[in-house]
Amino acid sequence: MDINLFDFHLPEELIAQVPLEERETSRLMVLDRETGDIEHKHFTDILSYLHEGDCLVLNETKVMPARLHGVKEDTGAHIEVLLLKQEEGDKWETLVKPAKRVKEGTVISFGEGKLKATCTGTADQGGRQLEFSYDGIFYEILDELGEMPLPPYIKETLEDRDRYQTVYAKEIGSAAAPTAGLHFTEELLEKLKQKGVELAFITLHVGLGTFRPVSADTIEEHHMHAEYYHMSEETAALLNRVKENGGRIITVGTTSTRTLETIATDHDGKLCAASGWTDIFMYPGYEFKAIDGLITNFHLPKSTLIMLVSAFANRDNVLHAYNEAVKEKYRFFSFGDAMFVASHAKMGNK
């Protein structure tokens, strides 16, 4: 399948550069995955579309301030490091810029020596294995010295780093935020609970592969990056109870979707406690096994994320919805507006 089938025209001014002042004031497009019907709403209207007995699945990963600026100890040359994945102990898989300056044995100093890293291995596309040394607690030092690793299409400085975290972020480990969750406030989540909507939490640590473009000409040639996920016994039991009682499982974001669909795929359609690495790739033709609805932001043209949404709601429906979003001047990408995709015609809104 040609990746150009997932292209659409997006004016640059529709790429949201900063978050809205209030999280829940973003707009919400409601898309019926079967009929393609569209409604234009505000995010707080999600209350009308979720019902008692439904369950929202939220990714409680927390973004690390994973971008570090340091200097080479021998020359003083500036080096930028992006933490991707913790390996064993203090060894990390990272991206460095400029990569040609960092070879095995290179020592980089951050924060006037508060944190040091030695290159212990090299990989393609600027990848480097670094081993860190420090006094104290690594994540406290990272919190002091690191910056939030905003996506490459965001050029503005983020004034408040909490705005690139969900209000329920808990498990540190992501290089990017699960952005569909950024629209929820604690008050909105409380109102949903009062209505009888269940909240379930999983963890998937988002990797930088999220922003890597599909370089192959056809979808089938593309290989997904692997990301770590975890679902507890408590969450699995809740989701199975919701299903047994006829409720809907609504994932908040593509990361929650990938987690549930990975587990269901690996366990004959069943949801159970599990953890591991997933490189699941969902595109048209994929049959969903776990979810009934999806809340997600508006994604990049030709990205694996728009392919996932197209697998769930039909490519023609999704591209029509995206073209409507452009016409109606919705805000796109990480700090943009949201879409709620489900079989709304069957449920109506209450």
From Swiss-Prot:
Catalyzed reactions: 7-aminomethyl-7-carbaguanosine(34) in tRNA + S-adenosyl-L-methionine = epoxyqueuosine(34) in tRNA + adenine + L-methionine + 2 H(+)
Keyword S-adenosyl-L-methionine tagged: yes
Localization (cell): Cytoplasm
Origin superkingdom: Bacteria
SUPFAM superfamilies the UniProt entry points to: QueA-like (SSF111337)
Enzyme nomenclature, EC number: 2.4.99.17
Disulphide connectivity of cysteines: none
GO biological process, alphabetically ordered: queuosine biosynthetic process; tRNA wobble guanine modification
Primary localisation category: cytoplasm
Transferase keyword on record: yes
GO CC annotation: cytoplasm
Quaternary context: Monomer.
Similarity-based family: Belongs to the QueA family.
NCBIfam families in the record: PRK00147.1 (NF001140), queA (TIGR00113)
Name the record gives this protein: S-adenosylmethionine:tRNA ribosyltransferase-isomerase
Native source species: Bacillus anthracis
